[in-house]
Amino acid sequence: MQSFHVLQLIAVGFGGALGAMARFIVSNQVYAWWGRDFAWGTLVVNSLGSFAIGLIMILMIDKFHASVEMRSFLIVGFLGAFTTFSTFSFETYSFLQTGEITKAMLNIGVSVLTGLFAVWLGIWTGKQFFSP
């Protein structure tokens, strides 16, 4: 079993708290703008988080050589709490339970494809603007 430093644990905790608050704010604002007919809030935070992880990984590895504590804060803590697979799964299940099969399938397809595209876009952006 690999050990970790207490500072990593603290970094994950603080990052997680901030990420959870950011997710709450962003997803609620998205629902206020676009309504709750579809899982818009979850789709937006997961897409933003996917873009951010691609960009941040390039920046931390190629540009800034970030410490393990900073990586733990941003990737595991902040983005781990900001994005949410469990909410995506529950919303999809709820669509299925209410017979909204099209919405369920759309949620799965759009979420996965948007997430993959956002990661690619984040990596591409990082390499275009920040790599040597």
From Swiss-Prot:
Entry binding sites for Na(+): G80, T83
Gene Ontology BP annotations: cellular detoxification of fluoride
GO molecular function: fluoride channel activity; metal ion binding
Membrane topology: Multi-pass membrane protein
Listed InterPro entries: FluC (IPR003691)
Top-level taxon: Bacteria
Activity regulation statement: Na(+) is not transported, but it plays an essential structural role and its presence is essential for fluoride channel function.
Reaction catalysed by this enzyme: fluoride(in) = fluoride(out)
Localization per record: Cell inner membrane
Residue ranges of the TM segments: 6-26, 41-61, 73-93, 104-124
Keywords from the named record: Cell inner membrane, Cell membrane, Ion channel, Ion transport, Membrane, Metal-binding, Sodium, Transmembrane, Transmembrane helix, Transport
Cellular component per GO, a single term: plasma membrane
Family statement: Belongs to the fluoride channel Fluc/FEX (TC 1.A.43) family.
Function of the protein: Fluoride-specific ion channel. Important for reducing fluoride concentration in the cell, thus reducing its toxicity.
Name assigned to this protein: Fluoride-specific ion channel FluC
The gene coding this protein: fluC
